[in-house]
């Protein structure tokens, strides 16, 4: 029997507002534990929540960027549950009237485009954070009340690879809107996955399991891959899939049972009595719509049509707003588009991945990389020298021309000087001359290598090849 995988993702995104969703407490990451808290966050008797209008605007902006319909009337609800990181014993959320509905994003997997539906986007407040120690737990309520949006996909995802692509695209869109930093390491983007299997051709969904503790996109992919195998094995052996919550253990690469899954009835939702419904007229919607900046798909199309970049290059450059903004700054400085793209996708990305950094954490500037690309384009430096210059400028922030002067890295293009290098290489390697005359093509490559060694990598390789062939013909 063959099974079809059905996956839906629930993504929580913290909005980077100055204050919290329903109180005036600061909503900043990294403060000392329990310092960004007030009586509203703690649910003291007699205090009342007040809706943060900026958070509502930003929730609408995110929903619009995800091609969603904005409700004219929306309300808040109480989600009742007890947990140590929830001092009020309820969370203010949205149940049956979310602010955004019926959206979608397009993803690319294996060169094909697929549309993934988005059921809803709703606003809510975040809970606090528990840190578990040996025999006790610490509670930090700084995060309590931070504005969140939860984005729930349709069960349109069929593979772990599609789930990964969906998360990448969703993160990029939210990042471009400017409403969140979407940093998983800081908790401003979190993901739960619902996954089930059903026989190929069957319309009815199978029983789903929810996966938690997915702390990176790669863990989402690995957790789903394991869960597909686990559920398939259970079903093939005649077993039954239970509706349960499981967590991904990154050390074993397996999912582990946490608890039997609750349904929405367990939370006893009811309308929030301390907040009136929100009425969102067309004028409000248009003000928010006008605030949406250029999104990744628009930039991608521009990079292909205006700058002549391949689809793949345009896709990679627009995956993060930071990289895309950097590229645009280089173009504004008249750097060659393709060379700039090659360096950002190659040398820059390699450096960032190796050092686990983001662009803003380096000393690299668009001005310096543009200068280096121009020097490379006009033949002032070779690719080999460019790599040396880049290694220095990304660490120090020095201008490429300054680095070249300090290290004597200017490419040598003077014909007489190059001819002297060629002559020295030929005099030192008579056997290579014989090999060339006997039709051995590798001899030329060897001699070019010797010339580059003599010139300490500074010889212009194009001119070297030309002069070398001329001199070989004379011998």
From Swiss-Prot:
Xref: InterPro entries: Asn/Gln-tRNA_amidoTrfase_suB/E, Asn/Gln-tRNA_Trfase_suB/E_cat, Asn/Gln_amidotransferase, Asn/Gln_tRNA_amidoTrase-B-like, GatB, GatB_C_1, GatB_Yqey_C_2, Gln-tRNA_amidoTrfase_suB_CS
GO molecular function (one): glutaminyl-tRNA synthase (glutamine-hydrolyzing) activity
Spans through the membrane: none
Top-level taxon of the source organism: Bacteria
One GO biological process term: translation
Reaction it catalyzes: L-glutamyl-tRNA(Gln) + L-glutamine + ATP + H2O = L-glutaminyl-tRNA(Gln) + L-glutamate + ADP + phosphate + H(+); L-aspartyl-tRNA(Asn) + L-glutamine + ATP + H2O = L-asparaginyl-tRNA(Asn) + L-glutamate + ADP + phosphate + 2 H(+)
Key words, A-Z: ATP-binding, Ligase, Nucleotide-binding, Protein biosynthesis
EC number(s) on file: 6.3.5.-
ATP-binding recorded as keyword: yes
HAMAP family: GatB
NCBIfam families reported for this sequence: gatB, PRK05477.1-1, PRK05477.1-2, PRK05477.1-4
Family per similarity comment: Belongs to the GatB/GatE family. GatB subfamily.
Complexes and interactors: Heterotrimer of A, B and C subunits.
Function: Allows the formation of correctly charged Asn-tRNA(Asn) or Gln-tRNA(Gln) through the transamidation of misacylated Asp-tRNA(Asn) or Glu-tRNA(Gln) in organisms which lack either or both of asparaginyl-tRNA or glutaminyl-tRNA synthetases. The reaction takes place in the presence of glutamine and ATP through an activated phospho-Asp-tRNA(Asn) or phospho-Glu-tRNA(Gln).
Protein name, as recorded: Aspartyl/glutamyl-tRNA(Asn/Gln) amidotransferase subunit B
Organism: Macrococcus caseolyticus (strain JCSC5402) (Macrococcoides caseolyticum)
